Amino acid sequence: MKKFLLSSSVLSANFSRLGEDIFDVLKSGSDMIHYDVMDNHYVKNLTFGPIVLESLRSVEKIKSMVIDVHLMTCPVDDLIIKFAKLDVNIISFHPESTNNVEKTIKLIKSYGCKVGLALNPLTPLCVLDNVLDKIDLILLMSVNPGFPGQKFIPSILNKIRIVRELIDKSKKNILLEVDGGINLSNIFKIASFGTDIFVIGSAIFNSINYDLTIRSFRDVLKNINCKK
């Protein structure tokens, strides 16, 4: 049975009670926390930095959470070091944000973190050609990065299918993560095209009952496994 993972994006959380929101979604069954870092240069928004995460890591009831960091910054290397020192689990970056993709991959690995390469909707898949054997995760953006609450771009489904085929053909243990506009109406289709990790923000944090919402996502994904 395929294991699907839910990564709750705190970009959609209530910032006035961020620690409590994170605790609540983890308690409700989220597998990890997706931590979007934006610098108002690479994308036109400004979000969290390492200081906020360091503070969250000090909260006893959530300090062991799995952290999936998505860097939408330029440059990235200095921030990679700061986040890696906070014992994050995954660090994903965009190939356009560095002068040397392979060097940045090595930097992340040198700190013992898993490496993700993040691709915007218009980023060509040829950027994967020389690094597929060096990364642990491919993060496909299914919205234009920068702001929460956007609608899923339908054409990304074909991109998911192609990347899934590339991963399977490589026979590498690479996870495929999709981020943007995922909800209860479209997660079945997104999963059926080969996604492993679903970054979900508004659909969880804007819901009244995290337990019920996350359970509903799990129920849909169970149906995928039943049909295989």
Curated annotation (Swiss-Prot):
UniProt cross-references to SUPFAM superfamilies, sorted A to Z: Ribulose-phoshate binding barrel
EC numbers: 5.1.3.1
One record GO biological process: pentose-phosphate shunt
GO molecular function list: D-ribulose-phosphate 3-epimerase activity; metal ion binding
Cofactor descriptive note: Binds 1 divalent metal cation per subunit.
Gene3D superfamilies on file: Aldolase class I (3.20.20.70)
Keywords: Carbohydrate metabolism, Isomerase, Metal-binding
InterPro entries (alphabetical): Aldolase_TIM, Ribul_P_3_epim, Ribul_P_3_epim-like, RibuloseP-bd_barrel
Summary of the function given for this chain in its UniProt record: Catalyzes the reversible epimerization of D-ribulose 5-phosphate to D-xylulose 5-phosphate.
Protein name, per record: Ribulose-phosphate 3-epimerase
Lineage, broadest ranks: Bacteria, Pseudomonadati, Pseudomonadota, Gammaproteobacteria, Enterobacterales
